[in-house]
Amino acid sequence: MKFNALLVSAAMMVMTLAACGDDDPVNPDNNQGGNEDTETVEGDVEGTWKANSIILVSGHITVPAGKSLTIEEGVQVIFDDKGVGANHVPVEFTVDGNLYCKGTAENPVLFSVAEENRTKENTFAGLWGGIVASNSCEEMLIDHTVIEYTGGQVVEGSPAAANGVYTAGDDAYPQITTNNIKGKYVITNSVLRNGWSDGIYLMGGQAVS
C-alpha cells in the first residue's frame, strides 16, 4: 500500500505540473545551449545519452529487455513527426528494459518534436507515439522531464499494436504507458503537455522510494 500511495502521489504531482501551461517551472528552453553532441537513432538503444546532447529519433526505438538507457540532464530527444512507413505510424519509444531520465530543475530532459512544429495548431496533433513500457520493464525513472506533442493514433504496424498493448484503429497513445504489474516507476517533477490522449496509463506497479 505504501508503494501504491507513493506512485499515486508522484502521478498527481506530474498532472498538477502539466496543468501549469506556459507558467511551468520546468522550461525546455533551458537546455537549448551548450549542446555537446547530436546523434540520430532508431532501433535498439541502450547505455547513456550524455548531458545536453540532441538525440534525433528517425524511427521506432526500443530499450531491449535486460538493458538500460540513462538520459542525463539537458538531453533533447526529438522525434520525427512524419511517422514510419506507408501508414505513417507514429514513432514510438518502447521500453522493454529499464529507463532512467535524470533531468534537473534548471536543465530538464525534453521529449518533443522539431522546434518549428511546436505550435498551437499542433497541440493535439499527436505527432509521436509516446513512451510505452512493456511488461518486461522493471524500472522507469522520469524526473525533471518534459514530454509533449504525443498521442498519435495506434495504427496497423505500430509496435504497441503488434505487441498487444493497444488495438490499432481504436486507441491513441498516452504520453506514458506502463504494463508490468511488478514494475517500479517514479514519475515526478515533470511536465506532460500538448498530448492528444491520456497523460499516464498505469497498469499497476510499485513506486521506487
Where are these regions (language model features)?
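Bacterial N-terminal signal peptides that target proteins for export
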Residues: 1-8
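C-terminal motif of bacterial Sec signal peptides marking the signal peptidase cleavage site
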Residues: 16-19
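Beta-strand/loop edge motif enriched in small/polar residues
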Residues: 21-209
